[in-house]
Amino acid sequence: KAVGVAGTIYGLDPSKTQLDQASKRCSEFENIRLIERNADDSQLQSDCCHSATSTQALEYIPDVDISLDEITRILKPGGAFVNVSILWDHFKFHGADHRLNERIHEAFRAHCSHQMLPMELPGKLERRGFKNIQDQPLAFVITRRDENSPAHYSEAVMANFALTQGVSEAEVLDWKSQLEKAEQ
């Protein structure tokens, strides 16, 4: 509806698995084109999009400036860009022993290239000619780690990643156990 019958929505992701999921979710729409590409080389025409969005993606791209240049290239003059990213330095679990919790979180820092991208982004966009740059904080607090909770997923991702960064399995299991006990 947002782009009308003549408009096109482009979905860009380097992961075929993600695009397969998107294809299933969007199967009822005829004007969505999914592209298996990286954000730094969409192969879209210049000035072809009225808006572009990125949701928790740019912080994982080592050279985010190249991707921002690509976004700038494909946007029509006056086009809008919306980014949703987490301030990873402020993303924390609470309840576990402070030292152990910090060890897990410190290990997790290596999971993305730009821990604090929302703080860097306004200057980067301004240098590319963007106007009316605005920030909108989206705070969220999750108090339960049930099976459908983002916290449940994040805990598993952080635990597995910590193992790849030299944190012992015993420490990871202890951390997870402490989180579970803190919730009770």
Model region roles, listed by residue range:
Residues 50-65:
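A short SAM/SAH-binding and catalytic strip from SAM-dependent methyltransferases
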Residues 40-52:
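A short acidic, Gly/Pro-enriched loop at the edge of an enzyme's catalytic core
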Residues 27-29, 99-101, 151-153:
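Short, hinge-like loop/turn segments at secondary-structure boundaries
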Residues 1-42, 66:
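Class I SAM-dependent methyltransferase SAM/SAH-binding core
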Residues 82-148, 160-165:
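Conserved catalytic/acceptor-binding region of the Class I
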Residues 65-80:
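A short glycine-rich, Lys/Arg-flanked "PGG" loop and its adjoining helix->strand segment in the class I
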